[in-house]
A protein has these predicted regions:
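Hydrophobic positions on the alpha1 helix immediately C-terminal to the Walker A/P-loop
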Residues: 5-9
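Structural recognition of the conserved hydrophobic beta-strand(s) that form the central parallel beta-sheet
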Residues: 60-61, 107-113, 134
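Conserved ATPase-coupling elements of RecA-like P-loop NTPase cores
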Residues: 36-37, 65-96, 120-121
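Short glycine-rich substrate-engagement loop in P-loop NTPases that contacts/grips substrate
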Residues: 25-55
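Post-Walker A helix-loop "phosphate-sensing" segment adjacent to the P-loop in P-loop NTPases
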Residues: 11-23
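Interdomain hinge/linker elements that couple catalytic modules in large macromolecular machines
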Residues: 134-190
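Short regulatory helix/loop adjacent to the ATP-binding pocket of P-loop NTPases
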Residues: 115-131, 147-148
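Hydrophobic positions in the central parallel beta-sheet of the AAA+
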Residues: 27, 59-62
Length: 190
């Protein structure tokens, strides 16, 4: 889906168009090796440090909604304590993103996949500094043009398995496993 689109397709396009690989940062915030970046202040520091000295850097923050809100450490003896996003002194991923978006050399891309990212207030929070692109499953028309088979057979397949790109590309044996995994991820995590 969106992560693959950004990581594989867009970063490949950037490289093909002359952007050096060391000017592209892709942080998957759902991976354990990036756990420290779930603190919004650490995330901001890491990105700024990585971009320092580069004329232009492309930063992809995948699953940004996983970044925790913290209380401002200035008011808590320097400690980074979890907060609710609504707490008066909370520092959230939105604060970090707004700060990073002010950096002249950073081209910033975010992905998110749950109800926090679907909120109509996100556009308000980003103060007109964002463009929202929603991704959904393939339409039947897209699915049928990809499958290139009799429309009735394509419809049967589409009704049975749907149009999630990962499922469409999988072999018959893997389709159910992928769908169950997607269902569990959405139902239990979101």
């Amino acid at each position: 889906g969106k992560s693959t689109l950004l990581k594989d397709l867009y970063t490949s396009w950037l490289k093909e168009n002359g952007v050096p690989e060391d000017h592209i940062l892709f942080l998957s915030l759902d991976k354990d090796e990036n756990a420290e970046c779930l603190d919004p202040l650490v995330l901001g520091q890491r990105v700024r440090s990585w971009c320092r000295g580069k004329d232009r850097c492309y930063v992809f923050l995948d699953e940004i909604q996983r970044v925790h809100a913290i209380h401002n450490p200035i008011f808590h003896e320097g400690k980074h304590l979890l907060a609710k996003p609504s707490d008066e002194d909370a520092i959230t991923f939105v604060s970090t993103v707004l700060g990073l978006s002010d950096e002249k050399n950073i081209d910033l891309y975010l992905t998110g996949s749950n109800s926090k990212m679907l909120s109509s207030s996100i556009a308000t929070e980003f103060r007109g500094k964002s463009t929202n692109i929603s991704m959904g499953p393939l339409s039947f028309s897209e699915f049928a043009s990809y499958r290139k088979e009799h429309p009735f057979l394509a419809l049967q397949e589409y009704l049975k398995y749907g149009g999630m790109p990962q499922v469409v590309l999988a072999g018959k044996k893997k389709k159910k496993t992928i769908l169950k995994s997607l269902f569990d991820a959405v139902y239990f995590k979101d």
